[in-house]
């Protein structure tokens, strides 16, 4: 079998050097860059697969300015044979939809499509640090018409030419069997990427790299670049902190430091979360006519993800912004929720009681477990049939791959990981019109230091909402709605991916959203595998406190904890009354997931750790000294002022 292994990589700015231009787009001209971390794991996965297929052709591809050749040469030095760069000024400002289209067009130009006679596999990183959408791998796969697996930790090839992938899902993992060709996006928890030898690095310096422009690959300008992308960045605002300065404990011993913490906790300290700066430039709205671009599109559609026989919490959360948007749109705008699976009708009542006006049921025994190919096809058919103006997904493992594939099918842009959704207007100065109503999708970006407002001009407008950001609507017992059925046209090729195993246990993971206290460990608390972190949470539970433990991304990346416990921009957003950060440096991506906590206590050995700038109380010390002292205090009745659940 003449297999071709293709790796897609991106060169990204160092987080410390991220800069933004006046147009709200990333300014890469002066930033030092590296290969995106997740992409490195994709490169390594390709090299690992080559062990089974030693004659495989190894290709690495990228899209970007000429400076991206540096990243491609690194890939060549690691063991890849050919390198291709799509570089054209007309691609500048492309959103993920346009990027996925451009990359897939380059791959088709190179001879790769679902009808290719020889098998191929595409590897990519889960997401990039400068965008964090996780959309492009899915969009490339959809444009090529091939199956995919996202959030994959490890892969192996079986003896029948299939790929077996282990991927992370909420609360556990899943094993999928995919035929080739297929696309795989890797998490940074797989086989660590190798370092090239000096000989290979020198050899790569002189290797040739093929550079394409859009004319070379037959790509027009209609759907690329800033003008052709279906979404734009309309506004970017700074996110500023309103938490008061941290109150540090003083003392020489762990006992004195904990005594100081207890004393400080007893004092009245006002706490406020981060918020977007309120200073706004006063500008007059021009006297342009209003234009409603929706045509016949009307209504809001959401997808209800089903896990363990229940509607996922994140899908219920979606109904909160959906109701707000429906109220803002007025004109009797309805919320329809699609429910796909086997024997799922009884779940419709839960959706009615939480705000859905209509539940559209799609029944099929083959859909008992979520599969991206049939689910994306079903929802795309439903969108064509119902013509909604807005479609919302939760930004779960499934939602992050489902939404972008549907976006390609409908020609819509997709805004990822939104923390705010509302209806507004857009002043189009070029055409001298005011577009209204239009969905304003707000998402943190540039390391969570900015809040970008994204607008989509192709209907439906599609957005994913960060799990844990919105409250679940208040349940209205007995509320009724319209129960409908939808019968899609199935394609047998949509069922070519097999689920070999699904392991999903909620346990304490669901309790992260309901906990009053979360004890979270970072790299600085991994000396014992987070044992002390878990012991502190357990001690609080034994006293009747609703407590759970969690971790930062680096702990998951190092394989110490499962992804389902990760807090932060690429994990969960939580709102406990008290968040205890132990050995967590304070990367802004982690702070994004805890900024709405009532109080934050930080414990770190480094007095200059940035986590203290985002905390209410702090202790400088070794976690191995401080946490055992806290555990003893809890066992003796100290519960951080929390209410104790009645037995």
Feature map (PLM): residue ranges:
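N-terminal glycine-rich FAD/FM-binding segment characteristic of electron-transfer flavoproteins
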Residues: 1-647
